[in-house]
């Protein structure tokens, strides 16, 4: 059986699902989180980033020492910027026969990983503009099975659930809440902010409201996911589609988004996807009320297709 060393961000259920689908491709997987995510490490990352990086370098060196005598067909990274270039080069020298593959679901503007690109045989990105600018392979994010297998009953309820790390995204959400209140639109949401984000908002003169420090409970998620329409607002430093868009395309929902590039996609239809600009939500009410039919889910965006493309 072929073998993969997988080093990547540990992000909710998504990492486990990626591993499961790699195994379906008949690979044996050895996985390590890319970043130390215990509470102490998170605090160190915020307060003493240089000391944290030294600690993380030692962690990566321990991984390399542990795996130095194991042979792998593929060494897969999902994100790489948390590993020093020195350690990546050392890992590549240790496993010179392996094929090195990188997937980025952040943009170069968010985390500049360009210096790492020459050390990979293939580099994928979720950001279509980065793919064009740096000659990378464009591969959108994916929908996992718990979202792709269940189709939603049509209704006029809008929902949002997600982490908000950027001031612009928070401002957009607050403006949309006001729009919905004014137009009698049912908008269900769970906005999660970290203490760091709250400090950023306060420093920008914004009083945070309508948010939580905690993830939505399973009960609240079931309530939110009764909605047939999703509201999306992207980080303006990134051009790729959010996981929110992909998952809701896969589950057959209607989408309200500010990512105008979606109008160029083969799955786009104006009956299903509404694109707003800045804080102008004119036309959203009519879009919500429209009952025109559209094509449902998008099998090409399911996680199985995503993993297959990564390993091809």
Where in the sequence are the language-model features?
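Nucleotide-sugar donor-binding catalytic core of glycosyltransferases
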Residues: 2-21, 27-54, 58-59, 69, ...
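Active-site proximal beta-strand in glycosyltransferases
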Residues: 92-106, 124
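N-terminal Rossmann-like NAD(P) cofactor-binding module of classical short-chain dehydrogenase/reductase
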Residues: 76
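Pol beta-like nucleotidyltransferase catalytic core
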Residues: 180, 250, 254-312
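Short amphipathic alpha-helix with an adjacent loop that forms part of the alpha/beta core around
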Residues: 63-69, 283-288
């Amino acid at each position: 059986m072929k073998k993969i060393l997988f080093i990547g961000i540990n992000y909710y259920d998504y990492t486990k699902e990626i591993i499961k689908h790699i195994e379906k491709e008949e690979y044996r997987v050895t996985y390590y989180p890319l970043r130390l995510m215990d509470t102490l490490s998170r605090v160190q990352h915020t307060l003493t980033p240089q000391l944290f990086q030294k600690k993380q370098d030692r962690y990566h060196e321990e991984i390399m020492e542990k795996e130095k005598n194991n042979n792998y067909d593929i060494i897969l990274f999902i994100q790489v910027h948390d590993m020093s270039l020195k350690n990546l080069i050392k890992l590549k020298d240790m496993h010179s026969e392996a094929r090195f593959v990188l997937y980025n679901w952040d943009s170069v503007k968010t985390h500049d990983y360009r210096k790492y690109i020459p050390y990979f045989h293939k580099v994928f990105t979720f950001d279509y503009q980065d793919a064009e600018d740096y000659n990378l392979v464009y591969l959108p994010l994916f929908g996992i099975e718990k979202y792709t297998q269940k189709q939603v009953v049509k209704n006029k309820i809008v929902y949002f659930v997600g982490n908000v790390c950027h001031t612009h995204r928070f401002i957009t959400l607050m403006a949309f809440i006001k729009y919905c209140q004014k137009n009698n639109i049912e908008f269900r949401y769970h906005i999660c902010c970290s203490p760091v984000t709250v400090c950023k908002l306060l420093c920008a003169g914004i009083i945070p409201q309508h948010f939580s420090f905690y993830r939505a409970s399973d009960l609240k998620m079931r309530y939110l996911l009764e909605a047939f329409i999703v509201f999306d607002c992207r980080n303006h430093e990134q051009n790729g589609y959010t996981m929110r868009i992909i998952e809701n395309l896969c589950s057959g929902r209607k989408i309200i988004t500010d990512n105008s590039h979606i109008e160029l996609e083969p799955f786009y239809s104006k009956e299903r996807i509404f694109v707003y600009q800045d804080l102008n939500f004119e036309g959203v009410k009519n879009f919500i009320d429209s009952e025109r039919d559209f094509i449902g889910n998008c099998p090409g965006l399911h996680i199985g297709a995503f993993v297959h493309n990564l390993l091809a």
